[in-house]
Design a protein with these regions (language model features):
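Conserved, well-structured interaction surfaces
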Residues: 79-152, 166-197
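Sec-dependent bacterial lipoprotein signal peptides
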Residues: 1-21
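Aromatic- and glycine-enriched pocket-lining scaffold segments that form the walls
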Residues: 205-257
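Hydrophobic-face positions in mid-chain alpha helices that act as interaction patches
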Residues: 45, 239-298
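Membrane-proximal, proline-rich intrinsically disordered regions
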Residues: 23-72, 105, 121
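Alpha-helix C-terminal capping/termination sites
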Residues: 55, 144, 148-151, 230-238
Length: 298
């Protein structure tokens, strides 16, 4: 009888340990999941971030600040802008455009997330206009990469899997020409998508055109004209490409009022170039720029 009770006790303990082990594993599975943050966001909300980072950080950040000195729109008079002005170290320093380099790929990643979510099988499939907006922004950021860095990662960069991890940890280097090809393909796709419909209007999230697909379409054609002109010296048929430029221009903006202006700045949200000037006073008026304006009576 004593032996029976011992065996019974061991069996019960074993069963309980299995039960508690199972419960413990289930509990750990729940604990290990981040329930405090969303796992996915509607594409139209990501759009706001892509527009903002493109305008503020990528087009309006260090590129804008340093290039204004390099092309003599402004003069670097202090600290790093002085070194940029005198070409002592800033043009070749790996840290000069480090922040913008990271920003470009982060923005491109977000644009590609929108495109994937709005494509067939995605959680936002059917929102073709939103997809087209993201394709325009992806093209713009790809072209910034090509213009500023020449050969660079692009086709395999800024791609994530379903878990949010990079698809390629060491993406291949693309030729500058290949990056431009990708940008033009994005614009072709955008032109097709922007002429379709959205299931949900992104008006409130679109900080450029308040959901106006026609204006985004004009922006896409304007960028096609710009990038075709950028490539004219490598063109196999310049006359034909110039005809394309005229065609794209005819489908683009009719006045300055239609330009893609990121017009959200105020006293609390200042333009990054002005913010840099106020914080560091590193830029001064350019004599060359003044002379050109006087020459053209502008």
């Amino acid at each position: 009888m004593k032996t029976y009770n011992i065996i019974k006790g061991i069996f019960a303990a074993t069963v309980l340990s299995v039960v508690f082990s199972g419960c413990s594993e289930d509990a750990m599975d729940r604990i290990n999941k981040d329930h405090g943050h969303t796992q996915s966001v509607a594409a139209r909300f990501i759009l706001t971030d892509v527009i903002t980072s493109t305008a503020f950080s990528n087009a309006g950040g260090d590129f804008n600040t340093y290039l204004s000195a390099y092309i003599e729109y402004e003069v670097g008079v202090d600290n790093q802008l002085y070194y940029a002005e005198t070409r002592e170290s800033e043009p070749t320093s790996s840290s000069t455009f480090n922040n913008t380099w990271n920003g470009l790929y982060s923005t491109l990643k977000s644009a590609r997330i929108i495109i994937n979510q709005c494509s067939e099988g995605g959680i936002d499939h059917g929102n073709y206009v939103t997809k087209g907006m993201a394709e325009v922004l992806a093209a713009y950021n790809c072209a910034l990469i090509a213009d500023m860095f020449g050969d660079a990662p692009c086709s395999q960069a800024a791609l994530i899997d379903e878990n949010g991890s990079p698809v390629y940890l060491t993406p291949k280097m693309d030729k500058q020409e290949e990056i431009y090809t990708q940008a033009m393909q994005y614009l072709d796709d955008a032109i097709a998508d922007l002429q379709k419909e959205d299931l949900i209007d992104p008006e409130a999230q679109d900080l450029l055109y308040q959901g106006d697909a026609e204006k985004w379409l004009k922006l896409a054609y304007g960028l096609k004209a710009r990038y075709t002109m950028h490539l004219l010296k490598r063109s196999a048929n310049k006359d034909a490409d110039m005809e394309k430029v005229l065609e794209y221009v005819n489908n683009s903006f009719e006045s300055a009022e239609e330009q893609a202006a990121f017009d959200v700045y105020d006293a609390n949200n200042i333009n990054p170039l002005y913010g840099f000037f106020v914080a560091r006073a590193g830029l001064g008026a350019s004599e060359n720029m003044r002379s050109k304006l006087a020459e053209y009576n502008d």
